[in-house]
């Protein structure tokens, strides 16, 4: 659903407030392209910044919202698996860390309160579909595979990770479960729940909450920049 065009305002405001250069990869999307196309593109984009644009890995923060947050996490875990360079940090906005939607926040009450994601998810439930149908083939839907379900990942020796999530969104439990994994693995992290906010509220750059959230990100990047 997301694209460089759909996220132009969000990325522009975030780049301005953080004083950074942001590259938005035009990675392959489902349902036309199923997993692992997205993971392949994420790893390729990270390596291109190093090999073609002469960045060091310590200069790179991988970020993403919703499904892009999933991609950021699995890209990190794939790079760790390869034993290659890791990014300086991760910034995750309402990350889709549990594509199966097994957490406690996946319920009709929360769907009614999440004004962005709720209507779409309710249609999925009404049709008795899986949340990941447009992303995964059934043979890839292994909930123990961290390169698909990053809530099952091991984050030991990973770089600092920042998470922002709204309290009124269906994916709230994704972030909470991910936070528990980071605590378990002693991964440096900063976690923020935004009271009353819906899924990826950052898309509305005119809200004061969005500007404040972007300033949180700027502080995080300043703290951990090399």
Describe each PLM feature range:
Residues 1-226:
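Alpha/beta-hydrolase superfamily serine-hydrolase fold, recognizing
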């Amino acid at each position: 659903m997301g694209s460089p065009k759909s996220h132009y305002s969000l990325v522009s405001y975030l780049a301005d407030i953080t004083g950074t250069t942001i590259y938005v990869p035009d990675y392959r999307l489902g349902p036309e392209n199923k997993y692992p196309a997205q993971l392949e593109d994420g790893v390729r984009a990270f390596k291109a910044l190093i090999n073609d644009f002469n960045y060091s890995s310590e200069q790179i923060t991988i970020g993403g919202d919703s499904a892009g947050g999933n991609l950021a996490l699995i890209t990190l875990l794939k790079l760790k698996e390869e034993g290659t360079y890791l990014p300086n940090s991760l910034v995750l906005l309402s990350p889709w860390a549990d594509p199966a939607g097994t957490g406690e926040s996946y319920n009709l009450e929360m769907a009614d309160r999440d004004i962005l994601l709720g209507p779409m998810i309710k249609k999925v439930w009404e049709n008795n579909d899986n949340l990941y149908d447009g992303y995964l083939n059934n043979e890839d839907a292994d909930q123990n595979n961290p390169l698909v379900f990053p809530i099952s990942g091991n984050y030991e020796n990973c770089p600092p990770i920042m998470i922002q999530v709204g309290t009124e969104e269906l994916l709230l439990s994704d972030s909470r479960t991910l936070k528990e994994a980071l605590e378990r693995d002693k991964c440096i992290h900063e976690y923020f729940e935004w009271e009353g906010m819906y899924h990826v509220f950052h898309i509305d750059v005119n809200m004061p909450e969005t500007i404040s959230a972007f300033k949180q990100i700027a502080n995080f990047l300043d703290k951990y920049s090399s």
